[in-house]
Amino acid sequence: MQQKIRSPFVVVMGHVDVGKTLLLDKIRGTSVAYREPGMITQHIGMSLVPWPAVEKFAGPLVDRLKLRGRIWIPGFLFIDTPGHAAFSNLRKRGGSVADLAILVVDITSGLEDQGVESLKLIQSRGVPFVIAANKLDRIYGWKSVENRPFLFAVEEQEWHAVATLEEQIGKLITQLANLGIDADRYDRVRDFSKQVPIVPTSAVTGEGVADLLLVLAGVSQRFIPREKLQVRDGPARGVVMEVKEERGLGVVADVILYDGKLRKGDVIVTAGLDGSRQAKVRMLIMPKSLEEMRDPEDKFMAVQEVEAAAGVRVVAEGLEGVVAGAPLLAVWDPKDLPEALKSVGEEIAEIKIESDKEGVIVRADTFGTLESIILFLRQQGVPVRKADVGPPTHKDVVEAVLSRRKNPAYGAILAFNVKVPPEVETEAQSSGVKIIRGEILYRIFDEYVKWSTEVKTKTVEQVLSQLTRPAKIQILPGYVFRRSDPAIVGVKVLAGTLKPGVTLAKDGREVGKVMQIQRQGKPVAEAVAGDEVAISIQGDVIVGRQIKEGDVLYVYIPDEQARQWLFRYKQYLRKDEVEALEEYLKTRKKSA
């Protein structure tokens, strides 16, 4: 028996206001306008665009590109919610449930912050993608015709409109090249395994949408192994996209099934903050087809079973506390239940990190985004001490305080798309813990980098203020003003920085403490290499006995401080200070 092939899952991503939702609406419209009678194109949380509908919509372009009869995928399943969170939640062990991504970019302004973030997330999950250079209708002088393929449209434009388009695409190609991505307009790409295709589109007029769907089909067949799209006739596997309370139904979960079959009465295993849990399916809800949807208020129907690939609303006892991004497994044989609970528990444990190692604390709204953030932070060299889903807690503040003791730059909680309880905010402020929150990962990270740099600088300054700086001086012949109690002599600073309060050493042995430094009869805070100054030395020292005119003296530096200078803070010493320190340590060795 031939195994069923499912449609690839497609996620639309990009910066705010680039036209993601409008483009999705335009794509979904093709499935409505060119659907087969009775076909359910709308699922819970996603929309099916069948390949026959694409062929009807893009007929002339299909023929021009010689694709008729060559596409084996049944269609596309577009995730209805565009953006970062939806993509992050489409997670599974070893990769992503998403098979393809469309990165939507405003052709008039190029790649922006969230676009870059989306791009890095797509790459981190290894998902093939296509770039939709949207807002083609905004190109100066462009003449639009509704739903016209881009390849036909570009041939019918004035030269100046084409020139403007080429200029904007060129800028986008350069931006992508700076991120290490080789891209070009799709009709110029010769090797799709080496170059990312850019498809100019207009979500307003529909121009280029046919091209986008055909390029997606080509990319899917080029990069998605057929086995990945094969669906087993066994217990369902899926991912929770959203959990909410529905009047009359209680807590429900909107689930995307990517394999197997889910039936009414099935035991399912999923996860909450406290680990894996089981529930029993009471009802499965799907949208009605357009023909059945006679009453606008009556859009849904209960079904007995659902086969992958599908988006379905699951009503079950025990869904309270289940978190978006959690895996979902159906269990048909009770003997398989312990293994399913263990498997889901282990998968969640891989994301929820808690260890004694140094690092920041991370909080996110879903398991999917949490996993993405941890992956991103590690790539940026920021360790994570603890990560979890939901608002920050008292325990997080305690953990951050412990982290700060080891490294002040790790005394922070990064809160992605979650509210911070007022009492936790107050406790963090009084404990010196920084809470950085936001909805854009790059901005949270940039703010953390700025803050941690300030903390590191302040910490280093505090440490350096406690360390004795190296210096090398010579007693000037003929400039002994007082021989003892205290000795007052003229000296030249040969290297380093001399400050009051330091102890001087000769041949590695302490000889006295510098009480004051004067230049031309006035006290000064320090003297540097090349300065000639008078200093007073207190201690059991007599000029002519312990020290003599012409002697070279060094600032005495305790062994622990010398080690810190050499192995941790050497970059904060001037070259002459390093030389003074190294010479001083040699005199210590000789006297030892």
Swiss-Prot record:
Record InterPro entries: EFTU-type, P-loop_NTPase, Small_GTP-bd, T_Tr_GTP-bd_dom, TF_aIF-2_arc, TIF_IF2, TIF_IF2_dom3, TIF_IF2_dom3_sf
SUPFAM superfamilies: Initiation factor IF2/eIF5b, domain 3 (SSF52156), P-loop containing nucleoside triphosphate hydrolases (SSF52540), Translation proteins (SSF50447)
HAMAP family with a match to the protein in the record: IF_2_A
Region listing for G4, in residue ranges: 134-137
Region named G5: 202-204
One GO cellular component, as annotated: cytoplasm
CDD domains to which the protein is assigned, alphabetical: aeIF5B_II, IF2_aeIF5B_IV, IF2_eIF5B
Stretches the record annotates as G3: 80-83
Family listed: Belongs to the TRAFAC class translation factor GTPase superfamily. Classic translation factor GTPase family. IF-2 subfamily.
Annotated spans, G1: 14-21
Span list, region G2: 39-43
Organism of provenance: Pyrobaculum calidifontis (strain DSM 21063 / JCM 11548 / VA1)
Taxonomic superkingdom: Archaea
Molecular function via GO: GTP binding; GTPase activity; translation initiation factor activity
UniProt entry keywords in alphabetical sequence: GTP-binding, Initiation factor, Nucleotide-binding, Protein biosynthesis
Domain tr-type G: 5-226
Name of the protein this chain belongs to: Probable translation initiation factor IF-2
Binding site for GTP: 14-21, 80-84, 134-137
Known role: Function in general translation initiation by promoting the binding of the formylmethionine-tRNA to ribosomes. Seems to function along with eIF-2.
